[in-house]
């Protein structure tokens, strides 16, 4: 498939961002979403959840654990640390997808899709992103620039429908768009 510009993919297994998923055209970041059961919390003086949380999102306040969702990175480090099982995780690893990131002299933080996806959704999303890129970007235009020009909402709507895959042969047959 001839694309308008290079297309870099990054895959990281956790939110530490070692592979810089938000700074590549398509980035995958694994998450273990913790589930807090306040009924199981006994408000330990030395809370193992609070002690283990690398982002300091967990704090014991008035004898009960509180997890600040705006700070929590959903890394899953806290899962299994409480001897009373106050924190568990969703049954499977979920993934945050970033699209349109670049780094270097023209850096752009990738746009995070609005929802987590499962492992089975990743490969079709990569294919759909590449098809959208081919159909919407001008020659030598990076994916992030095309997203900024066309709109992240339009990209996301296309990625979560099957329209691009239904038109795959048509899109692949087209030449790369030239600047008007």
Give residue spans per PLM region.
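Generic non-transmembrane alpha-helical segments
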Residues: 52-53, 81, 128, 132-135, ...
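A hydrophobic, small-residue-rich beta->alpha segment in the mid-to-C-terminal subdomain
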Residues: 93, 102-138
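Ferredoxin-like iron-sulfur electron-transfer modules
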Residues: 3-6, 24-80, 86-94, 106, ...
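A gly/ser-rich beta-alpha-beta helix-loop segment of oxidoreductase catalytic cores
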Residues: 2-34, 152-154, 159-160
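Flexible, glycine/charged-enriched surface loops at secondary-structure junctions
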Residues: 1-7, 61, 135-149, 165-173, ...
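Accessory RNA-recognition modules of RNA-modification enzymes
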Residues: 89-90, 102, 111-116, 143-158, ...
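General structural feature for long, well-ordered alpha-helical segments within catalytic domains
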Residues: 10, 49, 74, 78, ...
């Amino acid at each position: 498939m001839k694309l308008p510009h290079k297309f870099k993919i990054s895959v990281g297994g956790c939110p530490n961002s070692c592979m810089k998923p938000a700074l590549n055209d398509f980035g995958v970041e694994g998450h273990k979403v913790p589930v807090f059961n306040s009924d199981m919390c006994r408000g330990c003086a030395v809370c193992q959840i609070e002690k283990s949380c690398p982002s300091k999102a967990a704090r014991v306040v008035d004898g009960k654990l509180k997890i600040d969702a705006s700070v929590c990175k959903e890394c899953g480090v806290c899962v299994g640390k409480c001897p009373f099982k106050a924190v568990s995780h969703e049954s499977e690893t979920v993934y945050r997808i970033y699209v349109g990131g670049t780094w270097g002299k023209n850096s752009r933080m990738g746009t995070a899709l609005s929802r987590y996806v499962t492992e089975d959704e990743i490969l079709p999303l990569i294919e759909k992103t590449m098809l959208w890129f081919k159909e919407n970007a001008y020659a030598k235009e990076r994916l992030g620039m095309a997203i900024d020009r066309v709109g992240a909402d339009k990209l996301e709507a296309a990625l979560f429908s099957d329209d691009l895959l239904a038109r795959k042969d048509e899109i692949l047959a087209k030449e790369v768009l030239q600047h008007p």
